[in-house]
Swiss-Prot record:
It comes from Legionella pneumophila (strain Paris). One of its GO terms (cellular component) is cytosol. This is Isoleucine--tRNA ligase. Its cofactor is Zn(2+). PROSITE patterns: AA_TRNA_LIGASE_I. A motif ('KMSKS' region) lies at residues 600-604. A motif ('HIGH' region) lies at residues 58-68. It holds the Pfam family zf-FPG_IleRS. It catalyses: tRNA(Ile) + L-isoleucine + ATP = L-isoleucyl-tRNA(Ile) + AMP + diphosphate. It is an enzyme of class 6 (ligase). Its EC number is 6.1.1.5. Belongs to the class-I aminoacyl-tRNA synthetase family. IleS type 1 subfamily. IleRS has two distinct active sites: one for aminoacylation and one for editing. The misactivated valine is translocated from the active site to the editing site, which sterically excludes the correctly activated isoleucine. The single editing site contains two valyl binding pockets, one specific for each substrate (Val-AMP or Val-tRNA(Ile)).
Amino acid sequence: MAEYKDTLNLPNTSFPMKASLSVREPEMLADWQAKGIYQKIRKARVGSKRFILHDGPPYANGHLHCGHALNKILKDIIIKSKTFSGFDAPFVPGWDCHGLPIELNVEKKVGKAGSKISPREFRAKCREYAASQIDIQRDEFQRLGVLGDWYNPYVTMDYHYEANIVRALGLMIKNGHLQQGFKPVHWCIDCGSALAEAEVDYEDKTSPSIDVAFSAVNPSEFLNCFETQPAVKPLILPIWTTTPWTLPANEAVCLHPEIDYALIDAGNSYYIVATDLVESVMARYGISHYKTSGSAKGRVFEHFKLQHPFYKRQVPVVLAEHVTTESGTGCVHTAPAHGPDDYLVGQSYQLPLINPVMANGCFAENVELFAGISVLKANETILAVLSERNVLLASESIRHSYPHCWRHKSPMIFLATPQWFISMDKSNLRQAIINEIDKVNWVPDWGKARISNMVENRPDWCISRQRSWGTPMPLFVHKTTRELHPDTLELIERVAVMIEKSGIDAWFDLDSSELLGDDAKHYDKITDTMDVWLDSGISHYSVLKHNNDLDFPADVYFEGSDQHRGWFNSSLTTAVAMYGVAPYKTVLTHGYTVDAEGKKLSKSKGNYVALDKLVNQHGADILRLWVASTDYRHEVSISEEIIKRNADAYRRIRNTARFLLANLFDFNPASDCIEAKELLELDRWALKRCQLLQEEIITAYENYHFHLIYQKIHNFCAVDMGSFYLDLIKDRQYTTAKDSIARRSCQTAMYHMVKAFTIWLAPILSFTAEEIWQTIPGNNSESIFIEHWYDAWPIIDAVNMEDWEQLHIVRDEVNKALEETRQRGEIGSALAAEVTVYADAKALPKLTRLGEELRFLFITSEAKACPISQSPKGLAVTDCGVSIQVTASAHEKCARCWHRREDVGQNQEHPELCLRCVGNISGYHEERLYI
């Protein structure tokens, strides 16, 4: 064989089998940056239709995790696929830079603002810290192969962006959406600030569950509402609560106007309880002997007076729709300072809005019985007071979902404080937002219901914060009337110009007289900062409307499912409040990253997968393949085992590319491509299969179904290529003459296929696709990412794809029969066999048409097809209607092609070869038509 090896066209390529991604990827990334590939992509698409995917800004704090990678890689896949589709698809990344997490990190180093360091110096340190985090995250995002305008990002702490936040506030004021109020808001005691809905996490917490007696001041007026005219004795409306610390702020007991309430005679006293809850309430109180003495609707008790359980004041019975009979008593403790429903009821009944709790979470000094006690520790004291006064009817502990600060993970409270709000209803904003939601394409479609529900039920948006590091609310309010200055809109623009020049310190350093002159003595300067969700939420204004390379509205916003209450919501609210339209056409949502069992990733649980470790060990392309392989619309599982499975799939893809490249080692597309009419039928089939598959892949990219692309490409490599086409062409590629039509035919097909295949891969396996691209013969563009979807296909005459599908099926059955024969020890390789296929009338013509080339379909030394009627008795018929007979060949093995042929040894000059091989090495070009 040694003397004939040099006569074979054996594959040869510089494209390595071992990927070594952790080494090659950084080198390629450096090359992209040195060549300015992103800028060249933009230049290549100048004048094309734009596609804008607007990046939701990650928070500039800490290293990236797998959730960041999932999000940015998905976006990158979209941007690159749209670029291949001919769009001008710029990607401008962003960062969210103000807010508490950065403050906390800076506090650890320099102390709190105003104590060890001045607020101005503190803000400078925050800015410095955020900038350092952006540098870290920028490098980590780029390492993932994400292309974008990384050195011209939008950054919410940039002076021009801060100025635009202020201008956005001005627009919302102009449109009548801002109002100030003393309202209950989510308050984090550790933060010392109000928080938005998006900054609240719900976690399980153990709380006291108590029932408290509110006694009727005048039992008769209650009893007179019942037709039974019961005898007069003490009467109690019991309330149930899990927040005893709010009882000092109680101003009413709330009933539902249309719920039926039962009058329960328990002997010494009456109870009024929702009829549906009587049994559970009496059981809780340990009262077994009682009777129902009447029933009445809740509305009949309106305005009747009750005695506060431990203060001298009397409180009214009020009515509201939020009362239910799901739990409790049907009588709801109402503290307007400590809950949004309570507040609304208080407003409608003009109840006192008295807040006994200070910003530090302690009761004020004038609060009787509980002065100075932290509300988080007050429950025990309050229960003791209730017991002393014999008004504690029941007490136990309950495990329930409770709001916690997203940053501190500590329980939050509702606290009435002076704040600024975007009113959801004042200028019909809520309905306008709901109308816009209907115009947006939500993917998955459940996103529409989710955000609609949030908008319908959300309270007014508290946008003010009592923090140092944030964009200021540049407002002046009258010292007496508390009204905004009449020139507020003009003043806001003047401040915006100042901030654009000097940053937010321009406001904090400002002396009011500089803007107001003599008016300054009548106005207070507001020192609150704005909610960071407003910062990122107005990116549609500061970025999409102010960057000439972008458009408004964006084609796509794409973030995790938590952003329905976060960035999707704040962006929608601000855009509608500012100019009446949604900022996006389509909203895509992906799930959270979880472990293989669907559990949240956590360092403490030991299931955390470190992103940097994955990238350094496996390479970014393996991570990108993991992203593409999952249906991101659900939770996305990741683990070392899952990544290893993706690495295995990657190797199959890489090996397919390597095989194609290795067989093009002597191919010059400019001179060696043959005309379409000369292509062998198998090669025409392969090219047609690729064209059809490309259409499916492009459609999947357009529909953002990346997991389908992964499946299609993997199947293409494993089935269409690995077990069929590439297997069949080896004999022709290796043994026929170098410049023969037969060989150049499959090389022509492989050339077109590898170019198309590489572009299919590029949005997902970006580094590997570029590596393949640089190895493909011919004059190729500087980078694959400047290309379009492949369209230089040969014009192919009709190929009967169904016939080839049938041939593929029969081949699979023959392979099974060969394997069974091999297992019995009758043959070694398939080339040691001769096969007879007995086929039905449908399959037979497809097989006999191939003639002598049928053996190349099965890769056996001999093959023939006969009518199934000639099948030997006892030979099984397969599901595809054929019977297969395998026998060991009795002929000698050709030393060059390894086929066992009758004519081996008939040529005296080459006695070890079959006559086909003799011809191929002697200048005779073997003719093939099909395979």
